[in-house]
């Protein structure tokens, strides 16, 4: 494309979308924030395969501050009269702090495919079995592991549009029984939306015929709760509460696995989410988890350790993943709200 053609394209695109605030934010993130952050921050972050763990429990899209409020000190930050910063909840885990150590670490991505690519796309991990509710594992690095257990295929709940935590926990225990000599990665879909218990926050702005949720013809219609917040369709407190409820939903299963499975377990996240924070160098508010945005709310994630008897680990080589049904993967990603 020539420079003149590029200018014409930009002008036409601006003319067609100038009144769509969602489009403007996306273009700012893609064309300004992302290149600047790539230049200044790169994709530096914790090398997951090289880190010290036997069992890695991944909470998809869980901000560090949300995790700290809900999982540390028995979830006291989600309880109480005013519910603290993240809303009023009465079903958080009780008891003492379940972790032996805790810190924040920097993730190698601000969205799941970026995190997967940054950690696993270039390697072979024959000592690891990946149990995942997130279909991106098949698309990005499905052949990198000894086995991938695709819970998004076997236990997708069409009524809620996601994989429930208990299905992932059951698959993880089965993998543990089958592979006592392998590292385990257990990737829950929560805290990523859809928000369990909040069907009115599904936002069906995605047509069933669209692939990976390409945009509607109607400008400014929200496709997900983050866009709905950006457009003023829901208030910040309501979204934060639903987001926190997803942590409440997944935490019992995540903590049970971390404490029960043999080995040094770590509970972490692949990325966080923005709820209107501003990302340098532009003053515009951003929402959700745009790729390549290296702001703390997105790339600072929890790293909570549960020490246990170490797991004997043996590398038996990687296995080729059965060719994923691309249409099925696309549909699962669409139902989970992903858009490319």
Q: Model features per residue range: what roles?
A:
Residues 1-340:
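Catalytic domains that recognize anionic headgroups
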């Amino acid at each position: 494309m020539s420079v003149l053609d590029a200018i014409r394209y930009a002008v036409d695109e601006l003319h067609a979308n100038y009144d769509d605030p969602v489009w403007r934010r996306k273009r700012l993130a893609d064309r300004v924030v992302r290149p600047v952050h790539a230049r200044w921050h790169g994709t530096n972050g914790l090398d997951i395969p090289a880190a010290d763990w036997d069992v890695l429990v991944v909470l998809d899209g869980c901000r560090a501050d949300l995790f700290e409020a809900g999982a540390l000190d028995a979830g006291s930050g989600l309880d109480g009269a005013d519910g603290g910063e993240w809303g009023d909840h009465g079903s958080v885990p009780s008891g003492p702090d379940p972790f032996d150590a805790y810190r924040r670490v920097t993730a190698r991505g601000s969205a799941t495919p970026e995190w997967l690519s940054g950690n696993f796309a270039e390697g072979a991990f024959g000592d690891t079995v990946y149990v995942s509710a997130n279909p991106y594992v098949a698309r990005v690095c499905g052949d990198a592991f000894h086995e991938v257990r695709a819970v998004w295929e076997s236990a997708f709940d069409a009524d809620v549009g996601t994989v429930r935590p208990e299905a992932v926990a059951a698959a993880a225990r089965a993998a543990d029984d089958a592979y006592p000599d392998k590292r385990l990665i257990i990737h829950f879909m929560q805290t990523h939306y859809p928000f369990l218990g909040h069907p009115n926050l599904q936002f069906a702005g995605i047509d069933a015929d669209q692939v990976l949720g390409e945009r509607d013809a109607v400008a400014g219609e929200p496709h997900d709760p983050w866009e709905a917040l950006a457009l003023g369709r829901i208030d910040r407190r309501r979204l934060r509460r639903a987001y926190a409820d997803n942590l409440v939903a997944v935490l019992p299963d995540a903590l049970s696995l971390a404490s029960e499975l043999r080995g040094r377990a770590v509970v972490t996240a692949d990325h966080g989410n923005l709820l209107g924070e501003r990302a340098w160098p532009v003053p515009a508010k951003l929402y959700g988890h745009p790729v390549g945005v290296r702001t703390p709310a997105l790339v600072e994630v929890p790293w909570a350790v549960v020490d246990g008897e170490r797991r004997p680990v043996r590398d038996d080589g990687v296995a080729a993943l059965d060719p994923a049904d691309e249409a099925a993967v696309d549909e699962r990603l669409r139902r989970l709200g992903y858009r490319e």
